[in-house]
Amino acid sequence: MLRSALLSAVLPLLRAQPFPCPKTCKCVVRDAAQCSGGSVAHIAELGLPTNLTHILLFRMDQGILRNHSFSGMTVLQRQMLSDSHISAIDPGTFNDLVKLKTLRLTRNKISRLPRAILDKMVLLEQLFLDHNALRDLDQNLFQQLRNLQELGLNQNQLSFLPANLFSSLRELKLLDLSRNNLTHLPKGLLGAQVKLEKLLLYSNQLTSVDSGLLSNLGALTELRLERNHLRSVAPGAFDRLGNLSSLTLSGNLLESLPPALFLHVSSVSRLTLFENPLEELPDVLFGEMAGLRELWLNGTHLSTLPAAAFRNLSGLQTLGLTRNPRLSALPRGVFQGLRELRVLGLHTNALAELRDDALRGLGHLRQVSLRHNRLRALPRTLFRNLSSLESVQLEHNQLETLPGDVFAALPQLTQVLLGHNPWLCDCGLWRFLQWLRHHPDILGRDEPPQCRGPEPRASLSFWELLQGDPWCPDPRSLPLDPPTENALEAPVPSWLPNSWQSQTWAQLVARGESPNNRLYWGLYILLLVAQAIIAAFIVFAMIKIGQLFRTLIREKLLLEAMGKSCN
C-alpha cells in the first residue's frame, strides 16, 4: 500500500515536462521565472516559455512595454513588473493573459493607460498601479474587471476621478487612493462598493467629506482620511459605517465637528483627530463606543473640554490630549467613566492646576504624562486609589514643592520624573525627600531634579540632598500637610511658639535662610524659664495673701469675743 501511494505521488512529477529557463532568469519554482536587467522593450527576446504561471520582472532599463511581450501566455496567473522605469504600454499588451489573477505594475513611470488595456483580464483579482505618474484614468478602464478585489492607485498624480470609474467593481474589498492630488470625490463614486473593507484616502488634498459619499459602505472596517485639507465633514457622514473599526481624521484643517458625528459608529476601536485646529468639541460627539480603545486629540486649539466629552467611552485604554497650547483647565469629572483607561497623555499643554479628583475612578491607569505644563502644585489626593499606576511624568513644570505622601500607597509605581522644575529645597519639601529616600530607584537618573534654592542648596540634585546630613531642624515635628483653611481658624494651643516667633520663622524660610537653631532653642528655653519664675512668683504671692487673710480673720474673731466679754 505504501509503495503504491509513493508511486502515485511521484509519477505526475516524472511525467511533467520541464521548461527551459532563460539564461538571464532564475527558475527556482516550477512554472515560474524571475528576471532582472535587460530592456523593457525586448522582453519577448528573453525567450520566456508560454506555459509559465508566474513571472517576476524587475530593475529593467527604461522603455515601452510592447504588445508582443507576453504573446501566447494564456495560463499566466501572476505577473509582476516593478522598478523597471516603464514609460508607456502599447494597446493589446495583455490581450493573451486571460487567466491572470494578479497584475503588479508598481514603481514605474507610467503616465497613462490605454482605454481597453485591461479588458481581456476578466478573472483579475488584484491590480496594483501604485508609485507611477498617472494623471487621469479613462472612465471605462475597469469596466470588465468584475472579479477585482484589490485595487492600488496610490502614489500617483491623480487629481480627478470620473464618477462611474468603479461602477463595475462590486467585489472590491481594498481601494487605495492615497498620496495623490485628489481635491474632491464625486457623488456616486463609491456607490457600488458594498463589500469594500478598506478605503485609504490619506495624503491627498480633499477639502470635505460630503453627505452620502460613504452611505453604501456598510462593510467598511478601515477609513483613512488623515493628512488632507479637510475643513468640513457633513453631519451623519459616518452614520452608515456600522462595521468601522479604525477612523483617522488627523492632520487636516478641521476647526469644528458636527454634533453627534460619531454617534452611530459603535464598532470603532481607534480614532485619531490630532493635528487639527479644533476650537471646541460639541457637548455630544460620541455615542456608546465601548469598543473604542484609542483616541488622539493632540495638537489642537482646544482651550477646554465638555464635562461629559468622554462619558460614553467606557472601553477606552489610551487617551492622547497633548500639545494643545490653549488647554489651560480641565472641567470636573471630564474623565469620569473611563474605567479601563491605561495611558493618559496630558503633556505639553498650558495646565496650571489640577483638581484633587481629576483622576478619580481611573483604577486601571498605568501611565500619566503631565510634563511641559505650568503646574505649580499638586493636590495631596491627586493619585489616591490609583493602585495600577506605574509611571508619572512631571518634568518641565513650575513645581516648587510636593506633599510628602503624594505618591503614597501606589504599589506598582516604578517611575517618577521630576526634572526641570524650580524646586524650593526647604523644610516644606523635607517629607517628600524622606519618602524618596525609601524609594531611591523610582526617580529617573538621566535628568535628576535640582534645587533652585535656597542657598546653600541651590543647584544641588535631590540625590546630593539625600546623601548629605539633615538640614531641616527636627523633621519629625514638621506637619504632614500644609494647614487647611479650617486649621487656620482653629485656636492655637498654648504650647506652640507665639506669633512673633512664627513670623520670624516664616520670614527666614521665605528668604531662603536657614534659621539659627541654637538661638531659637535658647530663646525658647529662656521663655520657659521666665514662665516658670512668673508662675512661682504668683504661687508664692497667693500663699502669702492666703496667710494674711487667715490672720485678719483670726484677729477679727478675737475682737468680737472680747467685746462680748465686756458686755
Swiss-Prot record:
Cytoplasmic topological intervals: 544-567
Which regions of this chain are Extracellular-facing, per the record's topological domains? 17-522
The UniProt record lists the keyword Mitochondrion? no
Glycosylation sites recorded in the entry for this protein: 51, 67, 181, 243, 298, 312, 385
Q: Which PROSITE patterns match?
A: LRR
Q: LRRCT domain location, by residue?
A: 421-474
LRR repeats located where? 75-96, 99-120, 123-144, 147-168, 171-193, 195-216, 219-240, 243-264, 267-288, 291-312, 315-337, 340-361, 364-385, 388-409
Keywords assigned by UniProt, alphabetized: Blood coagulation, Cell adhesion, Glycoprotein, Hemostasis, Leucine-rich repeat, Membrane, Repeat, Signal, Transmembrane, Transmembrane helix
Q: Which Pfam families match?
A: LRR_8
The signal peptide here is: 1-16
Q: Which PANTHER family match?
A: IG(IMMUNOGLOBULIN) AND LRR(LEUCINE RICH REPEAT) DOMAINS, LEUCINE RICH REPEAT CONTAINING 53
The name this protein goes by in its record:
Platelet glycoprotein V
